[in-house]
Amino acid sequence: MTLSKEHKAAVITQFGGNDKNTGKTEVQVALFSRRITELTGHLQQHPKDKHSRRGLLMIVGKRKKALKYLQQVNIARYRQVLADLDLRK
């Protein structure tokens, strides 16, 4: 259920510029979104897996907080992330 090193590195370089820039909010949101997608697929196959559902909800909350922070700090970067990840609005 975790991201492979190759997928994680690709997401980091796409949103962070280089593979060392993991602390950037855009990178964190992108990694959360990728993990949410994988967990959603897992839960469709295993609907009674309550522990994974709780983990999914926690990651959704973390992504929501990171997006709220990004919206307050830099609205242009926030809108760009929403467009790149095909999220709401």
From Swiss-Prot:
Keyword rRNA-binding: yes
GO cellular component, one term: cytosolic small ribosomal subunit
UniProt keyword list: Ribonucleoprotein, Ribosomal protein, RNA-binding, rRNA-binding
GO process terms (BP): translation
Keyword Ribosomal protein carried by entry: yes
Subunit-structure text: Part of the 30S ribosomal subunit. Forms a bridge to the 50S subunit in the 70S ribosome, contacting the 23S rRNA.
Name this protein carries in UniProt: Small ribosomal subunit protein uS15
Species name: Chlorobium luteolum (strain DSM 273 / BCRC 81028 / 2530) (Pelodictyon luteolum)
